[in-house]
């Protein structure tokens, strides 16, 4: 396991009451419909042309900028090469979500593989919708059972046919947050249903230094991304147990890759309406007590 990582303990971000909450403010809304007829994995020629064009832009521009901005270090690329033949048959990768650009770091780390990823529907209607969509973002439908069925079907078919799907199993982005939050089971359900492995990745922090510190300040931590070994689902036990087992194994793996002993991580491995734990004081975080009281009054 890596050495104990740097903990930024940021007081800047409005971390939410529940560990899967979004605090990012999206300014635009084009009211796009993500229903049962939406092409979640778009196979049209028009989409593929634009997808390739954006890939060139990301590799040529965004990846170098990201690498310089956070002085990105990637460790464990040997595991991509070592398990290349297995990964070519389909894989679900997971990681913590700690930076607005960290998906670019993932894309860089797993080259030559090209991933898709589930994306918050609000983001897919917002000002960054084009960038998100053409870098593999798949909008997660909300409040529509038939749409959710088609979303899941498209993803499982993509994985089963040899595709790569990257998931932020914590459910949302919390910038500069060190603990590994509880995982939702969706990614692990896809892995079990398709019989494909989970590939754990983890971001951890380093103290800012050099030009990054001068330009962005002492509260802009540097990033390290570590790539682990594939974890295969246990196909000998019933599906619900296999999903739970895989979720726990993956959470422990991400903790270790981030330099955290699983038994010392402050959160459980599986999300269950889990509340944020304030192990340090962040005045900008959503107040826990007040929100709890409000929820009680509403009931």
What are these regions (language model features)?
Residues 51-52, 118, 144-145, 176-178:
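A generic secondary-structure micro-motif detector
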Residues 51-70, 133:
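Short hydrophobic helices that act as membrane-entry/anchoring signals
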Residues 70-77, 147-149, 207-208:
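Short gly/ser/thr-rich secondary-structure transition/capping motifs
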Residues 85-145:
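Catalytic core of membrane glycerolipid acyltransferases/transacylases, capturing the structured
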């Amino acid at each position: 396991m890596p050495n104990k990582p740097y903990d930024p303990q940021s007081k800047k971000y409005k971390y939410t009451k529940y560990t899967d909450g979004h605090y990012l403010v999206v300014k635009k809304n084009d009211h796009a419909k993500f229903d049962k007829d939406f092409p979640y994995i778009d196979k049209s020629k028009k989409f593929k042309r634009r997808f390739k064009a954006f890939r060139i832009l990301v590799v040529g521009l965004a990846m170098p900028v990201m690498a310089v901005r956070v002085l990105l270090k990637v460790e464990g690329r040997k595991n991509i090469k070592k398990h290349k033949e297995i990964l070519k048959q389909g894989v679900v990768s997971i990681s913590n979500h700690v930076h607005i650009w960290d998906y670019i770091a993932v894309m860089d780390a797993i080259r030559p593989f090209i991933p898709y990823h589930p994306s918050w529907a609000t983001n897919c209607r917002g000002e960054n919708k084009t960038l998100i969509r053409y870098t593999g973002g798949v909008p997660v439908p909300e409040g529509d059972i038939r749409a959710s069925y088609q979303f899941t079907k498209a993803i499982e078919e993509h994985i089963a046919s040899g595709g790569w799907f990257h998931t932020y199993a914590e459910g949302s982005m919390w910038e500069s947050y060190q603990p590994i939050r509880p995982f939702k089971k969706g990614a692990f359900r896809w892995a079990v249903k398709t019989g494909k492995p989970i590939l754990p990745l983890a971001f951890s922090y380093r103290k800012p230094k050099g030009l990054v510190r001068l330009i962005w300040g002492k509260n802009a931590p540097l990033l390290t991304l570590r790539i682990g070994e594939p974890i295969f689902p246990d196909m000998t036990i019933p599906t619900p147990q296999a999903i739970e087992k895989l979720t726990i194994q993956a959470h422990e793996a991400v903790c270790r890759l981030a330099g955290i002993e699983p038994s010392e991580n402050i959160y459980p491995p599986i999300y269950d309406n889990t509340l944020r734990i304030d192990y340090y004081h962040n005045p900008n975080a959503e107040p826990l007590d007040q929100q709890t009281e409000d929820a009680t009054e509403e009931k």
